[in-house]
Amino acid sequence: MRKIILLLLSAVVLTGSAKTKKRPAVETWPDGTEMDGWFADTTKVDVASLGRQYIITDYGVGHDSTIVQTTAIQAVIDRAARDGGGVVVVPEGTFLTGALVFKQGTHLHVKGRLKGSERIADFPVVMTRIEGETCKYFAALVNADGLDGFTISGQGTIDGNGLHYWQEFWIRRSWNPQCTNKDAQRPRLTYVSNSKNVTIQDVRLVNSPFWTNHVYKSDHVRYLDCYIYAPTENVWSPDPRRGAPSSDAIDIDACTDVMVNGCFMHVNDDAVVLKGGKGTWADKDETNGDCERILIQNCRYGRVHGCLTLGSESLHDRNIILRNCYTERADRVLWFKMRPDTP
């Protein structure tokens, strides 16, 4: 029997507004353990403290929004890493790219628009994590694996450019109603794995072809004041009811100590999703794991299927708090998606 224990939903506002209650000096999780002071700190990362800034157009990336410049942008990331780290800056303008891989000591600051290619060939097949299993699948637009202190920041936009991918999905689904999420080949927007002390702040994360943000086997991860959006209708002319399929806002997969604070989420699927693995032997597979100590607060939801969803690839979820949030059009505040094949 799956153990989903000690879930607390406190001060969830469905309509209108509510007075914020004064918090106790020492906060606790639902099981009575003391909440670490890390969760009280919503201070933004000071980009100036992250080291030298590498403005991509100063290092060979052109001001041309019509050509895919993956190689040139990746070269800037690689140079920053060789030089000891720093901030890769996307300036004003639109820059088209495929999969980018960040390295230890490098960070991403977006002022303009970093836009994903509509060609799946620009996203290599790699060993990754998707839908509760470790397998070969396409890299995301922004990838960070095994990093300590990685930061995405800025008032700009990371745009997945998903329309082509969404339309292909609905064409496949109309031809074959059994078409799965992975049958339609689509990249995610951001994928952070095996990392710690990660902050994603202020940035606009929009139009993801697949899941918008996916964080796996990581700890002490913060999403602060992000704007996360994918259309919920009118992406496929034969059926205007169709939106961006499987565009979850934030998928938290086998992670501990995650905070989502002050974010806006409007997507054609679930908002914050807890995942961990699937299958008969899911709890025996070392690539799977629990989600523990997850705090979601001060967020606003537009149209979403579930504000907080557990599953369907979920194992043991403990000490989860959703509080002081506002929803306009959510189908559900809390949704349990149970799988008969998973203990």
Q: What residue spans do the PLM features occupy?
A:
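Residue-level marker of regulatory loop/turn positions in helix-turn-helix DNA-binding domains and
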Residues: 182-184, 192, 215, 242, ...
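Hydrophobic h-region of N-terminal signal peptides that target proteins for export
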Residues: 9-17
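Transmembrane beta-strand segments that form the barrel wall of outer-membrane beta-barrel proteins
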Residues: 93, 308-310, 334, 338
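Short, T/G/N/S-enriched strand-turn elements that build extracellular solenoid repeat scaffolds
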Residues: 77-81, 96-104, 211-217, 261-263, ...
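Extracellular "leader-to-stem" segments immediately downstream of a signal peptide or signal-anchor
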Residues: 1-3, 16-107, 113-194, 199-201, ...
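Short, intrinsically disordered, charge-balanced linker/junction segments flanking boundaries
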Residues: 340-343
